[in-house]
């Protein structure tokens, strides 16, 4: 019997460029730049976005005149420019569509000016109850530069932090629940579920810059053509797509492993055989395969459950390293410890000078006692 071997392209990890692209390649971090000063605004018609820090937790946006920039509410750290020339307003883009899909209705601060200015934004998102709930995992930026050749589907509901551009278009769509026929034929399967949540996603296209925030560090996994990448659904921040209806052509829910299927089939066969015979007729050699099949099903089924999806290339997937169980941490303020009551000696002090005119400070419980002691020294 001949054994066929298949070559598998290794997945390399290396430093990523400043901006993430949609071309296939290796697994890289997005981005890892050293913290620098806020760049001075320069005239022009192009908006510039730069992620700062390691990991990048701050984004600097240089905005030309008459071009609005949208920053998530509560994320603006500093503004460089003449404040009297900058107009600020709070908006909620596509709030009705997001509300119908069960998505997060985020408010953004819209900044526009008659002359160039720069904005410094933070990757942290505001919390509704900061005294009770705080984020346990820090957030970092992944900067995207769109030139019209590739679009992005932002799956994380709170990932869109900053966006601006002369021809940047944003829209909210419902996530497809079944894969396309073309993907089903390539996978040699039926139209299985995509594994995506029903809350929808934000489709970004056109020309401009976008800063996405993820928990932990954000990495770019570039999947080449005719290749697949199995990832946890909770770690996906965004996927590069070709149009607003391309997700069902590249994302499929990960089915159970073959070992799990074999185990379930073996357990079903054993169960059918056991029903046709009495329990007293069962032998040890019949019980062992049944127990082995049940154990294989219990162990293998959770390995590739509904929490994993397969992404088919060519495309780029942005992944966050922070797990879902680490995103929130409840903090309960305990009762304040009662401090000891203060006595008069804690806040009554007497200052005396010796013959060398050096001051001496000492505490006293009664000024009368200190005065009598001074009188005795005269």
Swiss-Prot record:
Belongs to the AIM24 family. This is Altered inheritance of mitochondria protein 24, mitochondrial. GO terms for biological process: inner mitochondrial membrane organization. It is found in: Mitochondrion. The lineage of its organism: Eukaryota, Fungi, Dikarya, Ascomycota, Saccharomycotina. The keyword Hydrolase does not apply. Gene3D superfamilies: Mitochondrial biogenesis AIM24 (3.60.160.10). One of its GO terms (cellular component) is mitochondrial inner membrane. It comes from the Eukaryota. The keyword Mitochondrion applies. Residues 1-50 form a transit peptide. Keywords: Mitochondrion, Transit peptide. It comes from Clavispora lusitaniae (strain ATCC 42720) (Yeast).
